[in-house]
Amino acid sequence: PSNCIGCGHCVEVCSAHAISFGDAGVSIDRSRCTVCLACANGCFANALRPVARLMTVGEVLAEVEKDKGFYDNTGGGLTVSGGEVLAHAKFAGALIDAAAARGISSCVDTSGFGSSRALLDLVSRPGVTDVLFDIKAVDDEVHREFVGVSVGPVLANVRLLSADEAILPKITVRMPLIAGVNDSEAAIRAAGDIVRECGIRRITLLPYHALGIAKARNIGSQQQEFTAPSDERVAEIKRYFEDDVGARTEVLGKL
């Protein structure tokens, strides 16, 4: 990290021996790191710093309540997201209930890949007014290649939620658009067929951006870089979902 002053304190406090110091500076073996945060908490130069912290439901709610005035004026509220919210479903459910008790509504943002029971439990809670459901690709081979898992559970879950008349109006399908990956005519029409079948009436298109590249680099990871479809192609996709599928469609990002 550019702020490093070469004091070597991080090497001394790392009980996992995941940090070494040489001519090239600090090197971190991520496979050995236990995320104890001793290095970051003791870094005088702030070259290593924690990007997250453990919190209780009450502590999170205290942060959320700081903006309650804005929620009251705009109709907004709390969004539980991730990562994947289903990886922390119990905590998310407790947070949603606590927020509802304070008069704060919640939105569940999910990839749809996880326990159907846990997902249904979360979105059925009285405090949940919106569900953002990601559909990245409908073709299973494409989904496995770029997401790493089968799209089967995702499609099963979106069908499960949309079959519930109380949940259906809450759902907005969100689709990242990546040139050469999921923006072909066949890919878009396959997604449109699912949306039409489920009776979902809201779609948000998310043209690809590279903001995650720097974040991945900062944690010693690598992320493949893609490109967004052209503005013209995004406009065509938007018209298709509006005119052929009958869904209100918005684009987040440059068009």
Q: Model-predicted segments: where are they?
A:
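Iron-sulfur cluster-binding cysteine motifs and their immediate structural context
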Residues: 9-28, 38-54
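Conserved dinucleotide-binding and phosphotransfer motif residues
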Residues: 17, 46, 98-102, 244-245
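Conserved AdoMet/S-adenosylmethionine-binding subsite of the radical SAM
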Residues: 58-214
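C-terminal accessory regions of radical SAM enzymes
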Residues: 185-189, 193-198, 206, 235-255
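N-terminal pre-triad scaffold of radical SAM enzymes
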Residues: 1-9, 26-35, 79
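A structural motif corresponding to the C-terminal lobe/cap of the Radical SAM core domain
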Residues: 193, 199-201, 216-242
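FAD-binding FR-type
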Residues: 32, 53-59
